[in-house]
Regions:
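Non-heme Fe(II) oxygenase catalytic core, chiefly the N-lobe of the double-stranded beta-helix
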Residues: 1-258, 263-292
């Protein structure tokens, strides 16, 4: 979408696109001072139009972070990660100077393995390395639009099986094994009886925009009803295809930045290029619906 058309359509905020595929900075909003309904409605529309938006120079307490997230919807509890003691809605994503692996260092959409995956994720930067630690995003509407008509038909009735604790992490360990070995960057909890393996359509329809998007990521282990050997060639192709450079944008963090993306039509990747430095991000996820 052209910037001029977008700018004309916003009265209360300024929306500055950061790439051709997706992503925009929203200017002129101080979340801590309160956001009125008209401004919030425009923020919500900018989020749907750009898939990922961010606000620089915000000075938020954890309570303000939670309150702003609740305006989007109910909080999605993280089944495998422990929240902050006084704010269980917030998961602290911390990588220390001595840790080698980071959290989110593979292309994925949050909570794909739950029956109702998080529709949105809201991250607030608390501490950053001097350089590095960017997050990359990929537009899954575009990925779907660009596959052939034949492949669209093939994918139409298929579901992907997503596992929240598989060994397809770079370490070769499950989450619980990483936590016990000190490789995890977030305190882990045992999910108990909670469901962390779910099947969802490989092509999902966005409930608010009506657009179709590919829904495949690093959590996707197989295609429902197919063997792993049968699933692997198609899934490997899709996993590579979904983050072609022309579908992506790259967000460079600054301290006090709030970034908010739509998990229903994007994937993201946390770049692990700041060894020897600390990075602390506060993460809240918004409850979604069953993908269809």
């Amino acid at each position: 979408a052209g910037t001029s058309a977008q700018q004309i359509s916003y009265k209360y905020i300024k929306v500055v696109p950061i790439a051709g595929a997706l992503g925009a900075e929203i200017e002129g909003v101080d979340i801590a001072s309160g956001v009125d309904d008209k401004t919030f409605d425009e923020i919500h529309r900018a989020w749907l139009e750009n898939n990922i938006v961010y606000f620089r120079d915000q000075n938020l307490t954890p309570a303000q972070h939670v309150a702003f997230a609740r305006r989007i919807g109910d909080i999605h509890p993280h089944l495998l990660n422990k929240g902050l003691e006084n704010f269980p809605e917030i998961v602290e994503v911390r990588k220390t100077p001595t840790q080698k692996l980071n959290n989110g260092g593979r292309w994925h959409s949050d909570q794909m393995y739950t029956p109702k995956p998080a529709k949105g994720t809201m991250l607030y930067s608390r501490e950053l390395p001097p350089v590095g630690g960017d997050t990359m995003f990929s537009n899954q509407y575009l990925a779907y639009d660009m596959i052939s008509e034949g492949l669209k038909k093939t994918l139409g009735g298929l579901k992907g099986v997503h596992n929240g604790d598989s060994r397809n992490h770079p370490s070769g360990l499950t989450r619980m094994e990483r936590a016990k070995s000190g490789l995890g960057t977030i305190p882990q909890v045992d999910p108990g009886d909670a469901q962390i393996v779910s099947a969802h359509p490989l092509v999902r329809t966005h409930p608010e925009t009506g657009r179709k998007a590919l829904y495949v990521g690093s959590h996707t282990e197989s295609i429902e009803g197919w063997s792993h050997a049968e699933s692997e060639p198609l899934l490997n192709y899709l996993k590579e295809f979904t983050h072609r450079p022309e579908f992506t944008c790259r967000v460079r963090w600054t301290k006090g930045m709030l970034t908010f993306w739509d998990n229903r039509c994007t994937q993201h990747f946390a770049v692990n290029d700041y060894q020897g430095h600390q990075r602390i991000i506060h993460k809240i996820m918004i409850q979604g619906d069953t993908p269809f």
